[in-house]
Amino acid sequence: MEGAGAGSGFRKELVSRLLHLHFKDDKTKVSGDALQLMVELLKVFVVEAAVRGVRQAQAEDALRVDVDQLEKVLPQLLLDF
């Protein structure tokens, strides 16, 4: 992700490359609007994962978020998306 604050997020080039890595047909194209939507979806997903990880860490009286907390919130997060 880019720097913190407003305007931070994933670069379109990165998201486009990630999408194309998983397309079965090399000729598949992604429109600019679809790409922008994926960028926003990834941004929301990552922020939500971080927030849920913090809440889980607080519930466990942990001082920092660790992989363990993220692993605990990930199943429900995936179901919510």
From Swiss-Prot:
Gene Ontology biological process terms from the UniProt entry: cell division; chromosome segregation; interstrand cross-link repair; kinetochore assembly; positive regulation of protein ubiquitination; replication fork processing; resolution of meiotic recombination intermediates
CDD domains: HFD_CENP-X
Presence of the UniProt keyword DNA damage in the record: yes
InterPro entries, per the entry: CENP-X
UniProt xrefs under Pfam families: CENP-X
Location of N-acetylmethionine modifications: 1
Predominant location category: nucleus
Compartments where located: Nucleus; Chromosome, Centromere; Chromosome, Centromere, Kinetochore
Keyword annotations: Acetylation, Cell cycle, Cell division, Centromere, Chromosome, DNA damage, DNA repair, DNA-binding, Kinetochore, Mitosis, Nucleus
A GO-annotated cellular component: nucleoplasm
UniProt feature coiled coil, ranges: none
GO MF annotations in UniProt: DNA binding
Subunit structure: Heterodimer with CENPX, sometimes called MHF; this interaction stabilizes both partners. MHF heterodimers can assemble to form tetrameric structures. MHF also coassemble with CENPT-CENPW heterodimers at centromeres to form the tetrameric CENP-T-W-S-X complex. Forms a discrete complex with FANCM and CENPX, called FANCM-MHF; this interaction, probably mediated by direct binding between CENPS and FANCM, leads to synergistic activation of double-stranded DNA binding and strongly stimulates FANCM-mediated DNA remodeling.
Protein purpose: DNA-binding component of the Fanconi anemia (FA) core complex. Required for the normal activation of the FA pathway, leading to monoubiquitination of the FANCI-FANCD2 complex in response to DNA damage, cellular resistance to DNA cross-linking drugs, and prevention of chromosomal breakage. In complex with CENPS (MHF heterodimer), crucial cofactor for FANCM in both binding and ATP-dependent remodeling of DNA. Stabilizes FANCM. In complex with CENPS and FANCM (but not other FANC proteins), rapidly recruited to blocked forks and promotes gene conversion at blocked replication forks.
Family listed: Belongs to the CENP-X/MHF2 family.
UniProt name for this protein: Centromere protein X
Native source species: Homo sapiens (Human)
